A protein has these predicted regions:
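Register position in tetratricopeptide repeats
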Residues: 70, 104, 131, 138-139, ...
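Terminal, low-structured helical/coil segments at or just beyond the last alpha-helical repeat
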Residues: 282, 287-319
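Helix-start (N-cap) detector for alpha-helical repeat units in TPR-like alpha-solenoids
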Residues: 58, 92-93, 126-127, 167-169, ...
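Conserved structural position within tetratricopeptide repeats
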Residues: 46, 52, 83-86, 117-120, ...
């Protein structure tokens, strides 16, 4: 009995902390007395334009661009970053900040190009990776694009290397993206790395168990779920997954117990109801199977689960 295993994906919170002047905040803050501030930077630009130092002039444009950004005038910010980069194309932070401005204007292709150039110029530029990840997560949330998903997985890997203290959550997220790409081998390696970095990472243990289950390595899957449940004994999805594995191992009594525990923790868990009802039916306990089917009928069922319910109904000859 192979059911699609529902996931409870815990996504890491990407907190982008940028310096107030040298780099704008991702989330624009309230504008500050715009006229007085911008006038001061206009004067700095005018002074730089009167001189012969092109790098000083580029820096003046860059600094004024950051002020425009803080005032949420992203068009003017981009114009100043353009001027700065025309004079000094090695300014990785100007590319990064222009990418932020483009992203806020929903010009996503331009934003991705600028993030890529910032990273090309400075391969250890953490903020550029973090903000590109933020944008790629948004772009791939509802419309999967294989190229963007692969870039996202690669970026999580880069962040795991650049920020060793955060390796576990970044490798976990990388694994989830690789699962979406159906790259099970690479996903397994990412979850392995997450668990090495944090052996008590329950979500990584759960996801790795699903991969073991998918390739038929039931003992390894069971071991990961046992560990996950010792660490988090109220994880309904882990009980459900372990029930599937025990059923596949020919242990229906233990499977029913696990499905029951999942339902104690989450009474409206439709997959667990379907699995337990089917197992009851296999054991000849039609009364219990019909009771679970009745509970299913009281739920607003996802359309993807409705065929399984109707197959179950026919199987137990329920009206």
């Amino acid at each position: 009995m192979k059911q699609r295993i529902g996931r409870c994906v815990a996504c890491i919170a990407l907190v982008i902390v940028l310096a107030a002047c040298s780099e704008p905040l991702v989330e624009p803050r309230a504008p500050r007395t715009p006229t007085a501030v911008i006038d001061r930077y206009n004067a700095i630009v005018a002074t730089a334009e009167a001189g012969d130092d092109l790098l000083m002039r580029a820096r003046a444009y860059y600094d004024r661009g950051n002020i425009w950004f803080e005032q949420q005038n992203y068009t003017e910010a981009i114009a100043d970053y353009d001027r700065a980069l025309a004079l000094d194309p090695s300014m990785s932070r100007a590319f990064h900040n222009r990418g932020l401005a483009y992203a806020l204007l929903k010009e996503y292709d331009a934003a991705l190009r600028d993030y890529a150039q910032a990273i090309h110029l400075d391969p250890a530029y953490r903020r550029a990776y973090e903000n590109r990840v933020r944008l790629l997560e948004e772009l791939t949330a509802s419309t999967p694009d294989e190229t963007l998903l692969q870039q996202l997985a690669d970026d999580y890997g880069s962040l795991a290397r650049l920020i060793p203290e955060a390796e576990a959550p970044y490798r976990y997220r990388q694994g989830l993206i690789l699962v979406r790409l159906n790259d099970r081998t690479a996903a397994r390696e990412a979850f392995d790395a997450a668990i090495r970095a944090r052996p008590q990472h329950v979500d990584a243990l759960y996801e790795r168990a699903l991969l073991h289950y998918a390739v038929g390595d039931l003992n390894a899957a069971l071991a990961d779920l046992d560990t996950a449940l010792r660490l988090s004994p109220r994880a309904a999805n882990a009980y459900y997954a372990r029930g599937l594995i025990r059923h596949a191992q020919g242990d229906p009594r233990s499977a029913i117990a696990d499905f029951g525990q999942a339902l104690l923790l989450r009474p409206d868990y439709p997959e667990a109801l379907i699995a337990r009802a089917a197992t009851y039916a296999e054991q000849g306990n039609i009364t219990a199977a019909r009771a679970d089917l009745k509970r299913l009928d009281e739920l607003q069922l996802d359309p993807a689960l409705q065929p399984a319910r109707e197959t179950l109904r026919i199987r137990i000859n329920a009206p």
